[in-house]
């Protein structure tokens, strides 16, 4: 999606008849996940299990810089589309391979869905309520999205090496596991040093305090971050809790982390004694590092975001699909949303006939045989 947002010609290749599973994630019968995350692409169907399907893929390759696949490792090789075959068709090809556990190793061919990786990576074990034995999974495809961002960066690195330094095409191996594991901070270093497994802290932090979400007297929630000593001190002083800084339990950042529960009790009481409006007045007047917890409703009503191009309504048939706008915003080469995710095989004729030169009869036969 990111490359397509900035003008790349991205062709989504799907299985004839069924298409990408994302098309089945519907809201009110509308595949909104597909509409948003498959935007700005072209869409063809192609069965690579069929010899003619593989031949068409190899014929297409020289027209493109990057091929991205997310099959279980070994699938391309099973169908005769190994790296040697692909680079023979296109020596400068960048092949980006996304999988759950990486392309090699004894576990590489296990099912590698994002939920499994979120469980296996340590993320779920360290996320959730410390008072509960139940680990917590994210409510959105975190591992998939993280690996996708790594894949985009890797493709650009490889293209830069090829086009600027005269390098060859190459294979990029991106695993969901390593992508998510890389976000967990110094977890391996902590374990190597202490041999202790980090436990769930809820909304608290191992690095600073106060940190958490606290309910107001009228039932709203405020998130607080004291991630630097001065931020924490200013927060406590602004809420009339400055005397806590004279208490050895809260005098330093290290002490505040060590006594996080006691600090939480004081902060919870201070925020809980005030309405959302009163808390916001203190936060804004003192430039505190705290903010109300917002839903999409509050985000759309936020005066700041109402002045920014955060959202865009994209025409799609008889409806508009509201979605997040292109980011990042570049001053000279801004991206754009040209279309929402399209229909299965919408560009078969344009690509197979106009660009690859298949005649109508040949394309009709391939369609009848389930090749496209």
Question: Model regions: which residues?
Answer:
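Aromatic-enriched alpha-helical interface/lid elements that frame and gate functional surfaces
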Residues: 210-286, 290
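N-terminal helix-loop segment corresponding to the beta1-alpha1 unit
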Residues: 1-165, 343, 347-372
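Terminal low-complexity tails and localization/encapsulation signals of metabolic enzymes
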Residues: 198, 215-217, 298-372
């Amino acid at each position: 999606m990111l490359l397509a947002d900035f003008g790349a010609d991205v062709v989504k290749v799907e299985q004839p008849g069924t298409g990408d599973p994302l098309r089945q994630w519907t809201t009110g019968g509308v595949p909104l996940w597909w509409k948003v995350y498959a935007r700005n692409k072209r869409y063809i169907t192609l069965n690579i299990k069929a010899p003619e399907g593989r031949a068409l893929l190899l014929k297409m390759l020289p027209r493109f810089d990057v091929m991205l696949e997310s099959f279980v490792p070994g699938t391309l090789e099973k169908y005769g589309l190994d790296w040697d075959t692909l680079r023979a068709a296109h020596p400068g090809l960048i092949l980006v391979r996304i999988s759950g556990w990486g392309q090699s190793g004894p576990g590489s061919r296990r099912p590698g869905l994002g939920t499994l990786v979120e469980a296996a990576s340590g993320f779920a074990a360290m996320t959730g309520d410390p008072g509960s034995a139940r680990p917590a999974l994210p409510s959105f495809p975190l591992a998939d999205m993280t690996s996708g961002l790594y894949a985009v960066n890797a493709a650009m690195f490889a293209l830069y090496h090829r086009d600027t330094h005269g390098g060859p095409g190459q294979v990029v191996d991106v695993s969901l596991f390593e992508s998510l594991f890389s976000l967990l901070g110094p977890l391996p270093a902590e374990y190597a040093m202490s041999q202790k497994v980090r436990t769930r802290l809820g909304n608290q932090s191992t690095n600073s305090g106060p940190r958490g979400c606290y309910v107001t007297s009228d039932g709203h929630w405020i998130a607080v971050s004291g991630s630097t000593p001065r931020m924490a001190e200013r927060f406590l002083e602004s809420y009339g809790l400055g005397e806590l800084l004279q208490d050895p339990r809260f005098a330093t950042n290290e002490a505040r982390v060590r006594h996080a529960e006691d600090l939480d009790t004081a902060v919870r009481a201070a925020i809980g004694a005030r309405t959302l409006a009163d808390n916001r007045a203190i936060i804004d007047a003192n430039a505190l590092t705290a903010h109300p917890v917002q839903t999409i409703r509050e985000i759309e009503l936020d005066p700041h975001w109402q002045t920014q191009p955060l959202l865009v309504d994209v025409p799609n048939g008889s409806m508009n699909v509201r979605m997040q706008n292109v980011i990042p915003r570049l001053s000279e080469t801004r991206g754009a949303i040209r279309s929402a995710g399209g229909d299965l095989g919408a560009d078969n004729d344009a690509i197979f006939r106009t660009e690859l030169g298949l005649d109508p009869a040949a394309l009709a036969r391939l369609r009848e045989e389930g090749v496209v």
